[in-house]
A protein has these predicted regions:
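Extracellular glycan-interacting surfaces
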Residues: 1-278
């Protein structure tokens, strides 16, 4: 990331920060000469590896950490803020863990409202029932990380209308989350089954359901592996990656769900008996 008030000229921005996916050694570096030379940032946590790096307009870095790069299981992690001017690190993790304990999960992404540096969101990876959560979570703060509110645990609603088949997919892999720079109520997160957006992010403050809508309209987040067109019945039977496959009676209409009984994560081949189509 580039320091928001750093010197800029024909060479570019002078002050640059880079996080590297390293563990048990220095993993955050700064350059004050346009990237010609680099030095490790003092006092940084090294017990995990960085998973995201954000910078606010008041010169504070926010880093999420995990003990693996993902998407494999994470057993430890945290969220830290670095005040560049004061050279001060602060643990602002939404779920605080005792010093001698591991979190049992990690943090994977962060976003800072460019118009309000105290407004941030972060997402977890592999959060489970150990801390009272049933799935991964997105946390929101409006005071710079002193207090956090869970968005999904507090109350939310999904709108699957653009892609009904996503109703069977659990919340997971929120590896990128973003607050719209032009609208702080508009936030986006990506998962293994598409992108989602909300236009009432602050609903969590009023205990109103935050509504998340699937963004896949004409673009499906999957890989077609096989197509079969029987003479009778369905027009097309598809085999796809991750979702198994679908039975399409009308190719121009969305299906409600994927194959079941049996269901395969990946369906690599589909065929039928041509002399006995039923």
């Amino acid at each position: 990331v580039f320091s928001p008030d750093a010197t800029q000229d024909k060479k570019g921005t002078r002050d640059i920060y880079v996080a590297v996916s390293l563990k048990d050694r220095e993993n955050l570096f700064v350059s004050h000469d346009y990237g010609d030379t680099w030095q490790p940032v003092e006092g940084q946590p090294t017990q995990y590896r960085p998973t995201s790096l954000s910078i606010s307009n008041n010169k504070e870095l926010v880093l999420t950490y995990g003990d693996t790069p993902g998407p494999s299981t994470m057993k430890d992690g945290g969220v830290w803020k670095y005040d560049i001017a004061k050279n001060k690190w602060t643990d602002i993790s939404p779920i605080r863990i005792k010093k001698d304990e591991k979190a049992g999960f990690g943090y994977i992404s962060s976003s800072i409202d460019p118009n309000n540096p105290k407004h941030m969101i972060v997402s977890t990876h592999h959060l489970d029932g150990k801390h009272g959560y049933t799935s991964d979570e997105m946390f929101r703060t409006t005071d710079g990380g002193k207090h956090w509110k869970p968005i999904f645990k507090t109350g939310f609603r999904y709108d699957h209308s653009k892609a009904p088949y996503t109703q069977v997919a659990p919340l997971h892999w929120m590896f990128d989350i973003e607050i719209n720079p032009g609208n702080p109520e508009h936030a986006i997160f990506t998962t293994g089954f598409g992108g989602w957006e909300t236009f009432n992010l602050s609903g969590v403050e009023r205990k109103e359901p935050v509504v998340w809508s699937i963004m896949s309209s004409g673009i499906e987040e999957t890989v077609p592996l096989e197509l079969y067109a029987p003479e009778k019945g369905a027009r097309i039977i598809s085999g796809v990656g991750d979702y198994g496959g679908f039975t399409h009676f009308r190719p121009d209409e969305l299906t409600d769900g994927s194959h079941s009984n049996p269901h395969f994560a990946n369906t690599n081949g589909v065929t039928g008996a041509w002399l006995k189509q039923e």
